[in-house]
Amino acid sequence: MENLSDRFNALQDQLMNIYETAANTLESQIEHWQTLRKEAVLLYFARQNGVTRLGYQVVPTLAISEAKAKQAIGMVLQLQSLQKSQFGSEPWSLVDTSGETFRSAPENHFKKGPVSVEVIYDNDKDNANAYTMWKHIYYQDDDEQWHKSASGVNHTGIYYMQGTFRNYYVLFADDATRYSKTGHWEVKVNKETVFTPVTSSTPPESPGGQADSNTSSKTPTTATDSTSRLSPADSRKQSQQANTKGRRYGRRPSSRTRRTTETRQRRRSRSKSRSRSRSRSRLRSRSRSQSSERRSRYRSRSRSRQKEVSRITTTTRGRGRGSSSTSSKRSQRARGRGRGGSRGRRSSSTSPTSSKRSRRESESSRQRGISPSDVGKSLQSVSSRNTGRLGRLLDEALDPPVILVRGDPNTLRCFRNRAKQKFTGLYRAFSTAWSWVAGDGTERLGRSRMLISFFSFNQRRDFDQTVKYPKGVDRSFGSFDSL
């Protein structure tokens, strides 16, 4: 008991010396967190052995001491990694390396230079909310290399540049749904108006809205986005401009290039006309074959009816030498039998065609699509029956597949950004980074998670085989009844 108290007092003295010195070096900050780790381990050991007090200090529970020790270990590892980078020689204070600053938005990042940002909703000064923008943000990429980025603010929110990508860590629209009634807000930085009130229905930098001229010049647009928004006339002009740019000193193409281009155009036009004529001939042959099949079926049915009628009349004539009443009754019975037989034969002859029609109708109704309410209904995997590519896609739409990735939140965000730039078309959508919360508290459980949705299982398979997952990120497959 006395030995634990002496060690605890020694650790308290070390912490007081660090606080009084207030050295702005990473070595001092690492020593501070190492001392906090030793203190948490000592308190954990004391509580485990039934000690509830060390002098005037109340020993916390095992869970609290364990959480503080893990936090201190994580901070020591982060600071040691930062010390090896080019930013290790910069001044770092206790506030810059504190746990509260490290966990504030953007989470798990070192930050410096806080700036107050005030957002006024509905032009009401009393209805305002304060945010913190950081001048400098330090983050790690997938290769565990440290980068220093500048932070900025616009009408959409507060962001920091991650290469050419704007990573927003505060979105004003999220709080506008709670505080604003008209959907308008005004952004002020250091009590100076930066953005005047604008409606939140189509804010800049958001899907469907236009970016500001000042901010749009900083982020380059990709070639796919610019070409997809052009009209056919604009695309022709763009191709002509590209051709003129390719010419050197504005000269016209030589006669050889003209001839080659003309021959290529002629070949393309000929191939197109041939393909059109072939498709027309195929359609004509199909229509002729279908009409011939219908005629042959109709002739066979009429012949069978004539044979039945002739056979019935011969039997009635042979037996009609008796009384006229009996012959008339028998002929009526024979006619009834003949009609019934012909009907029976007609039904038997038309049964395969009706089954084919029902199959075609079911296939056509299935290939037309599924209703929105049926999307995500099936919880079973798609069967391997021969339904065609379109039918398989429609069956898979009933059970949308997903991939759940787990890892560090910053690593998951970098992975999402890289996938959007390199692997567009191999997935449907990405979710934001999220985590599970304990049922009896607010502490987060495990690592951060992110969902990736797909249109089909084949698309998920192609994505999984093509994309390289970052180090420390694992995945699992699943599906939902709806998204």
From Swiss-Prot:
GO CC, one annotated term: host cell nucleus
Domain of life: Viruses
Record region (Transactivation domain): 1-201
SUPFAM superfamilies named in the record: E2 regulatory, transactivation domain, Viral DNA-binding domain
Single biological process term from Gene Ontology: regulation of DNA replication
Chain positions covered by the region annotation Disordered: 196-384
Annotated Basic residues bias: 245-258, 265-287, 330-346
UniProt keyword annotations, A-Z: Activator, DNA replication, DNA-binding, Early protein, Host nucleus, Phosphoprotein, Repressor, Transcription, Transcription regulation
Main location class: host cell
Polar residues bias: start-end ranges: 211-230
Localization in the cell: Host nucleus
Keyword Transmembrane helix attached: no
InterPro entries cross-referenced by the UniProt entry: E2/EBNA1_C_sf, Nucleotide-bd_a/b_plait_sf, Papillomavirus_E2_C, PPV_E2_N, Reg_prot_E2, Regulatory_protein_E2_N, Regulatory_protein_E2_N_1, Regulatory_protein_E2_N_2
Molecular function, one GO term: DNA-binding transcription factor activity
Coiled coil: none
Extent of Low complexity compositional bias: 311-329
Pfam families per UniProt: PPV_E2_C, PPV_E2_N
Location of region: DNA-binding domain: 399-483
Free-text description of this protein's post-translational modifications in UniProt: Phosphorylated.
Role description: Plays a role in the initiation of viral DNA replication. A dimer of E2 interacts with a dimer of E1 in order to improve specificity of E1 DNA binding activity. Once the complex recognizes and binds DNA at specific sites, the E2 dimer is removed from DNA. E2 also regulates viral transcription through binding to the E2RE response element (5'-ACCNNNNNNGGT-3') present in multiple copies in the regulatory regions of the viral genome. Activates or represses transcription depending on E2RE's position with regards to proximal promoter elements including the TATA-box.
Subunit details: Binds DNA as homodimer. Interacts with protein E1; this interaction greatly increases E1 DNA-binding activity. Interacts with protein L1; this interaction enhances E2-dependent replication and transcription activation. Interacts with protein L2; this interaction inhibits E2 transcriptional activity but not DNA replication function E2. Interacts with protein E7; this interaction inhibits E7 oncogenic activity. Interacts with host TAF1; this interaction modulates E2-dependent transcriptional regulation. Interacts with host BRD4; this interaction mediates E2 transcriptional activation function.
Family: Belongs to the papillomaviridae E2 protein family.
Protein name (Swiss-Prot/TrEMBL): Regulatory protein E2
Native source organism of the sequence: Human papillomavirus 14
Gene name of the record: E2
